[in-house]
Amino acid sequence: PSYTFVSTADAFVLRGATCVFVDIRPDTMNIDETKIEEAITEKTKAIVPVHYAGVSCAMDEIMAIAKKYNLKVVEDAAQGVNAFYKGKALGTIGDFGCYSFHETKNYSMGEGGAILFQDDRYLEPAEILREKGTNRSQYFRGQIDKYTWVGYGSSYLPSDMNAAYLWAQLEEADKINDKRLSIWNFYHEELKELEDKGVLERPYIPEYATHNAHMYYIKVKDLRVRTKLLAYLKERGILSVFHYVPLHSATAGKKFGRFHGEDVYTTKESERLCRLPMYYSLSLEEAAEVVKALKEFPEYETIEDR
């Protein structure tokens, strides 16, 4: 999808690949699985589903397409730690899965992430890539008597302090998840009234998805209304922000990628979306202030094509 963070594309562009973007689903903001097959050519190597807001893409359909065309599936599960598709952890369904532990994520070490893969053959090259192109990991395990430069790589190692900070959160993962879900559910229940009035839309969670309350967003009629709403919330001391600018509209996106088919929803939906405050230390009282402000916003317009 074009509606994602630039890192999704960078990983491929840095290796000389061309990114082919397809449209998203307006309900989940995830890649539209029905648009994938028509974008595949003899040059296609992989399908990259992005689990937006920790809500799973339709992975059965995506995996079936990948199998049909002998393609790899690389899950961008940056926002998907402790979220699931039909009971299976996001990032563990495709050939590869990528997690992020950036400061904005549910479990954070400031920067950094993790890669998961199904095939053990990728373990050694992944370690070499992480260890500056050396076989240092094997040396530390006592498998070799000295380490040396064996391939290309860079320095992707977190410090012990970063790792310890993350580990402590992972030990409390259920507690963190429960707290975030309580905030998410509070927003969802309290904002139903405005959705029923037709002035905003709440997130949609498919039956197959178990989300992790990574974010709570609303969608208003259009960019004009959103701009007014964000300014209004800022005046009330509430930080609400939009999210991605679609990659295919960016200078580099036009240079290194292309959009296949018609952009029916990607740009339109991205211009409607506002993210509400969502973090572990947010109290329900503070969330109630956000809801109160949203209910008092005077310039909503009816969403006519809901």
Question: For each of these PLM feature ranges, what is it?
Answer:
Residues 3-4, 17, 24, 78-79, ...:
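Histidine-centered beta-alpha loop that forms part of the nucleotide-sugar donor binding/catalytic region
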Residues 1-77, 84:
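PLP-dependent aminotransferase-like
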Residues 92-136, 160:
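Active-site PLP attachment segment
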